[in-house]
Amino acid sequence: MTAYVVFVRNEVTDAEEMKQYQAKAPLAREGRTLKPLAFYGAVETLEGQAVEGAVILEFPDVAEAHAWYDSPAYQDALQHRLKGADDRVFVIEGLPG
């Protein structure tokens, strides 16, 4: 079943760390089956606290989403995002069929 990884950016706290993340994160997509559906486009908050941005990535299934997230390439990039931004990231299964 299709799965989606959703990033919700609350705030960038260290621009230099985020530059490192932005340089390294694309390397983790190489050889992976994923499709960016939304990538820091215009965000309009309809309810709740406003966010700085959001990303939605589509994967064939939850296992592939975890394989990408847990990969050495993404983990190398992740350390910089964790130091450079306040984000929420989660995986959610799509609907069947």
Regions found by a protein language model. Give the residues of each.
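Short S/T/G/P-rich N-terminal loop/turn motif that feeds into the first structured element of a domain
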Residues: 1-53, 60-70, 93-97
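C-terminal structural segments of small proteins and small subunits
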Residues: 66-90
